[in-house]
Amino acid sequence: MPLLHLLRQNPVIAAVKDNASLQLAIDSECQFISVLYGNICTISNIVKKIKNAGKYAFIHVDLLEGASNKEVVIQFLKLVTEADGIISTKASMLKAARAEGFFCIHRLFIVDSISFHNIDKQVAQSNPDCIEILPGCMPKVLGWVTEKIRQPLIAGGLVCDEEDARNAINAGVVALSTTNTGVWTLAKKLL
């Protein structure tokens, strides 16, 4: 089954920033885990724990310590991990990830109207499978983005409670990515 279809059926992505939150995510109902920590020496074991739990692993490559902003890090991740996807703010990294067969998530920060109006250009360069918009607690803006681009959206950052989660889903996002363990418990409730 295509990963995007599975994501729609499991709309809460547990974002983890340390080993403690990784274990909580593995024990949660969330089927997708975004790894926001680690380094080139530990990432293989982090992903292995996720895969051994039968879950999907996305690596935020920009946050991986010891890795450069060069495309060779994507080849490295393909060789040493079984990750399913790559998250990045950089189009060049996502192009390299696509070439290696990874599911690609372009993370974009919308802080003003200029960043909103530049979304099309950035997405055209990266051609991702999904776009993660931060902060994810802006339902009006999320709605504008869903009308502007064809790729499915993930709401990330500052999704603090069930109200934020439902507002984002109602605005048209396919999933939420959050470090908030309280929102993780909504994994099946949001369907």
UniProtKB/Swiss-Prot annotation:
Pfam (any one): G3P_antiterm
InterPro entries: Aldolase_TIM, GlpP
GO biological process terms held by the UniProt record: glycerol metabolic process; regulation of DNA-templated transcription
Signal peptide start-end: none
Coiled coil: none
Record SUPFAM superfamilies: GlpP-like
Domain of life: Bacteria
The family this protein is said to belong to: To B.subtilis GlpP.
Protein name, as recorded: Uncharacterized protein YgcP
